[in-house]
Design a protein with these regions (language model features):
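Extracytoplasmic ligand-binding site segments that recognize negatively charged/polar headgroups
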Residues: 31, 45-60, 72-89, 93-226
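Short amphipathic alpha-helical coupling segments at ligand-binding clamshell hinges
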Residues: 58, 196, 200, 269-281, ...
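A bilobed periplasmic-binding-protein/Venus flytrap-type ligand-binding module shared by bacterial periplasmic
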Residues: 144-151, 187-190, 258-273, 289-290
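Extracellular/periplasmic bilobal clamshell ligand-binding domains
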Residues: 304-338
Length: 338
């Protein structure tokens, strides 16, 4: 009975927070929120897929900026983090404060009723596709084309994806089999037509594209000269390799961007601390730290440290995610993937 009473109290507390939202007083500064956050125990439970190589450069800056707060980084794949949060919520105790994972999984968490509608003031600096009522973009990953400079002559380097329709590329291309975002983005934003996008990728498929799982593996295959070009690589994989002398180059004229988002858990044990981090990471200050930490900042006014942002970008937005199954099926049919 005591356990049931405890669960009921927690349930209604979470429900209440979800209905009214957790918002600071109007015009409240980060330093004012910091004062409240320290009184909550000095801990931020950060559920995030932020790679350790980036986290060790980014998270300590927050801790130094806001003394008295230490970040407990719960690091796992995005699906495991959502599953963990669901299990905790069903058990009647929310443990996470902030969630920072790919947007697809942020939306899944919201559909499970785990996230708070916040409408952070910092989100006003972002375009519509990079924010929502319960999230704001933290960083981006750009799908671009790259090539081995030993195998591709300077005059043959691609300027746009259309250049890959040239017969010279047949049997020389690699890609990631799960990157249905390329088809979706081309259909929605490049061609604004399913028919034209499908026709384009069917022509690409006729070039006998070879598929390999893992974007890091694609980059290594390209560096090793086992393929001439990659169609669905991550732009941030190449600057460091080029600095080390790898014979590769990449195209930034156009590309597809997937979004990582930041959100606050309903019933977060440290609500002011969660709010502080979400506002900091979404603002200019935090976004500059993200860039210095090796990520592609989402803020329109903050440039990445390396040249990794595409000139023309087709963003995968929250509204697109519900159509993933549709385009995944078509993508697999086009390339005869299982």
């Amino acid at each position: 009975m005591a356990l049931l009473k405890r669960f009921s109290s927690l349930y209604f507390a979470v429900l209440f927070l979800g209905l009214i939202g957790f918002r600071p007083a109007s015009g409240e500064t980060l330093d004012e929120i910091h004062q409240k956050a320290v009184k909550e125990g000095g801990t931020l439970n950060f559920y995030g897929t932020l790679a350790q190589v980036n986290a060790e450069k980014i998270l300590p800056v927050f801790e130094k900026r806001f003394p008295g707060i230490k970040i407990n980084h719960v690091d796992a794949t995005s699906d495991k983090l959502v599953a963990r949060a669901v299990t905790e919520a069903r058990g009647g105790k929310t443990l996470g404060d902030v969630l920072q994972i790919p947007l697809e999984n942020v939306v899944q968490a919201h559909d499970q009723g785990l996230l708070l509608d916040t409408n952070l003031p910092e989100s006003s600096d972002y375009p519509v596709g990079l924010k929502g009522s319960f999230w704001v973009a933290s960083d981006l990953q750009y799908f671009i084309a790259a090539w081995n400079t030993n195998q591709v002559k300077k005059e043959e380097e691609p300027k746009t994806y259309d250049d890959f329709l040239n017969p010279r590329w047949k049997g020389r291309l690699i890609a990631e089999p799960r990157d249905l975002e390329m088809l979706l983005a081309f259909a929605k934003y490049r061609f604004k037509s399913d028919e034209k996008a499908i026709e384009f990728w069917k022509k690409i498929a006729a070039q006998n594209v070879e598929f390999h799982k893992g974007h890091s593996q694609l980059a290594e295959l390209l560096v090793a000269g086992q393929a001439a070009a990659c169609l669905t690589c991550y732009s941030h994989h190449y600057p460091s390799r080029i600095k080390k002398g790898a014979p590769v180059n990449y195209m930034l004229s156009e590309g597809v961007a997937s979004i990582n988002g930041t959100a606050i858990f309903k019933g977060a044990p440290h609500p002011n601390t969660a709010l502080l981090f979400a506002r900091w990471i979404g603002g200019l200050e935090g976004q500059k730290v993200m860039a210095q930490g090796g990520r592609n900042p989402a803020h329109p006014k903050v440039e990445p440290v390396e040249k990794t942002r595409t000139a023309k970008t087709y963003f995968i937005t929250a509204s697109d995610l519900k159509e993933f199954p549709k385009y995944d099926k078509i993508w697999k049919e086009i390339f005869k993937l299982r």
